[in-house]
């Protein structure tokens, strides 16, 4: 029985990056032996065990064979006869197919160390093309390691293109796809994730509404980058640089999908793209099974982001309606995320990344001014129900008028 450290822990140590979790592979052992040693079984599909003291995952060395479509279409074989090299060759990328023995010696049968040095993400074997989830995984790794200069090997991109063209991506479950998409959007370069998916044709299969934005022009006076798809990539990059949460990044990815519906004869203007895009955003949320906070914010940002940009021009009554639409008096954080998404949208324009966005402070200040209106005096007057709500709205509107007079340019 031999135990090896494998995968990401080995890769990140060689890159000098912090190691967050460690995976192990066990060669020459059976499931029965693992149980006798006190390991706890957790693998539903193949033998994976938790160490009785550390809780780290130990998997029996295994091989796999394609037996159906999609991520789950594999038959696994684990036995004491499976070698370390046989286990490593089933992995996706050479940089993930390295191991260390208990003395710290590196085992690298597939050139992972060489590819690390060359900053290349390269598949281990042609079996890569059997698992459609690997398209998303490789794009996610590209998003993670782009700041270090990594890129996807041309031949690997070719296999990813084959997978996209084969229709295999349609067999991925929404849950698996969302897990990869959400993790990728939180990487240092989420824009690279989208670009790699587009380069291999997978974006058209997974998020066709976003893919349709590339090549759609916008007015150069407002968008020096012109191309709507390029703008979305820039907005995502701003999200990462400003450490925005997943909900904001998801909303920013989808905020302009309505522009893909504009007839070419109307380009580069996109009248009412906010409302046109809502049905697309709703369909994407449902198809991807986006969690509620992400789905709700995406819909709200899609509908109201131009309100955010015109905040200083909004009438106090319109501003109050906006605050009410966001339920800001009970959910102030959601409105703060909306404001952040608007700012990322404004900064995601080529050459304007550092331009000030006074709308952000103005909107947050307006929300606070309305929130500060006390309810107690109205209750003391005996108001309740609809009467109380109307009186509270009048007081909030009065507060917003005073706020606008003080803070908005005349």
UniProtKB/Swiss-Prot annotation:
Keyword Membrane included in the entry's annotation: no
Cofactor: Mg(2+); Ni(2+)
Membership in a protein family: Belongs to the tRNA nucleotidyltransferase/poly(A) polymerase family. Bacterial CCA-adding enzyme type 1 subfamily.
GO function term, MF aspect, one: phosphatase activity
Any one of the GO BP annotations: RNA repair
Keywords attached to this entry: ATP-binding, Hydrolase, Magnesium, Metal-binding, Multifunctional enzyme, Nickel, Nucleotide-binding, Nucleotidyltransferase, RNA repair, RNA-binding, Transferase, tRNA processing
Positions of ATP binding: 8, 11, 91, 137, 140
Catalytic reaction annotation: a tRNA precursor + 2 CTP + ATP = a tRNA with a 3' CCA end + 3 diphosphate; a tRNA with a 3' CCA end + 2 CTP + ATP = a tRNA with a 3' CCACCA end + 3 diphosphate
Notes on the domains: Comprises two domains: an N-terminal domain containing the nucleotidyltransferase activity and a C-terminal HD domain associated with both phosphodiesterase and phosphatase activities.
CDD domains: HDc (cd00077), NT_ClassII-CCAase (cd05398)
Entry note: cofactor: Magnesium is required for nucleotidyltransferase activity. Nickel for phosphatase activity.
Protein name per UniProt: Multifunctional CCA protein
The species this protein was found in: Ectopseudomonas mendocina (strain ymp)
EC number: 2.7.7.72, 3.1.3.-, 3.1.4.-
Additional notes on this entry: A single active site specifically recognizes both ATP and CTP and is responsible for their addition.
Superkingdom: Bacteria
Domain (HD) ranges: 228-329
């Amino acid at each position: 029985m031999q135990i090896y450290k494998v995968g990401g822990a080995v890769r990140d140590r060689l890159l000098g990056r912090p190691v967050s979790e460690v995976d192990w592979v066990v060669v020459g052992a059976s499931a029965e032996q693992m149980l006798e040693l006190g390991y706890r079984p957790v693998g539903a599909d193949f033998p994976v065990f938790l160490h009785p003291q550390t809780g780290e995952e130990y998997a029996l060395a295994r091989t796999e064979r394609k037996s159906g479509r999609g991520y789950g279409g594999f038959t696994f074989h684990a036995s004491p006869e499976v070698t370390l090299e046989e286990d490593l060759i089933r992995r996706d990328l050479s940089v993930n197919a390295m191991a260390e023995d208990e003395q710290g010696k590196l085992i690298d049968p597939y050139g992972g160390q060489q590819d690390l040095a060359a900053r290349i993400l390269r598949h281990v074997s042609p079996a890569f093309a059997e698992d459609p989830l690997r398209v998303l995984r490789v794009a996610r790794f590209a998003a993670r390691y782009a700041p270090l200069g990594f890129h996807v090997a041309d031949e690997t991109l070719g296999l990813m293109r084959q997978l996209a063209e084969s229709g295999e991506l349609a067999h991925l479950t929404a849950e698996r796809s969302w897990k990869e998409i959400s993790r990728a959007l939180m990487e240092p370069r989420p824009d690279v994730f989208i670009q790699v998916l587009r380069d291999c044709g997978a974006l058209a299969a997974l998020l066709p509404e976003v893919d349709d934005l590339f090549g759609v022009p916008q007015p150069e006076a407002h968008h020096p980058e012109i191309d709507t798809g390029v703008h979305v990539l820039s907005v995502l990059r701003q999200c990462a640089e400003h450490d925005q949460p997943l909900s904001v990044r998801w909303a920013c990815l989808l905020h302009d999908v309505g522009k893909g519906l504009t007839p070419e004869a109307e380009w580069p203007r996109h009248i009412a793209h906010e409302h046109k895009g809502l049905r697309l955003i709703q369909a994407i949320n449902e198809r991807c099974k986006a969690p509620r906070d992400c789905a709700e914010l995406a819909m709200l940002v899609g509908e109201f982001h131009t309100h955010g940009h015109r905040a200083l021009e909004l009438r106090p009554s319109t501003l109050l309606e906006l605050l009410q639409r966001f339920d800001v008096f009970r959910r102030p954080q959601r409105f703060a995320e909306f404001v952040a998404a608007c700012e990322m949208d404004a900064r995601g324009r080529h050459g304007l990344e550092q331009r000030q966005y006074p709308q952000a402070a103005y909107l947050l200040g307006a929300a606070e001014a309305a929130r500060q209106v006390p309810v107690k005096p109205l209750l003391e007057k005996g108001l309740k129900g609809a009467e109380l709500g109307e009186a509270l709205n009048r007081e909030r509107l009065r507060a917003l008028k005073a706020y606008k007079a003080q803070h908005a340019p005349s």
